[in-house]
Amino acid sequence: MRFFSANAKEIKRFSTEQLSNLNLFDGEAFFGRLVCFTRGQVVPYHRHEHIDEVFDVLEGEGTILIDGREMPGAPGVILYVPAGTEHGFRADRSAQWVVRETVHERIYAGRAARMIIRAALKRLPVVGNKFR
């Protein structure tokens, strides 16, 4: 990954059709996005088995759903969501809401082995049902 610098106020983009996820940077197991909501947009309640996330509210206000609770998401709020924690977002307070998401993907030995095998199998030539 190369050095990255950006001004969120200059790169933010909004769409009323769908949520805007703008990739900021992407490393091997670490990446960042700018999530731009318009009023009414929702990220449904969900969880990630192998992903830790940090959310920083940069602009506007919305509702953060975490482990069955609701909390206001306003500028300055920083939320750490460890792997396995249920969370979601609801843009119900401001016309526009901007949240920076920083993600760290945990890669365990067993999962890494499966990923390597899957990648290797994709590269092997196949004749019928057998590998050459």
Residue ranges and their predicted role:
Residues 1-30, 44, 114-132:
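A short, N-terminal "cap"/entry segment at the start of jelly-roll beta-barrel domains
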Residues 33-48:
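Conserved short histidine dyad/triad with adjacent acidic residue
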Residues 34-36, 56, 91:
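Conserved hydrophobic "DFG−1" position in protein kinase catalytic cores
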Residues 50-52, 57-62:
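Glycine- and acidic-residue-biased ligand/ion/polar-headgroup-sensing regions
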Residues 69-83:
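Short acidic-glycine-tyrosine-enriched beta hairpin
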Residues 83-110:
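Ligand-binding loop in jelly-roll beta-barrel domains
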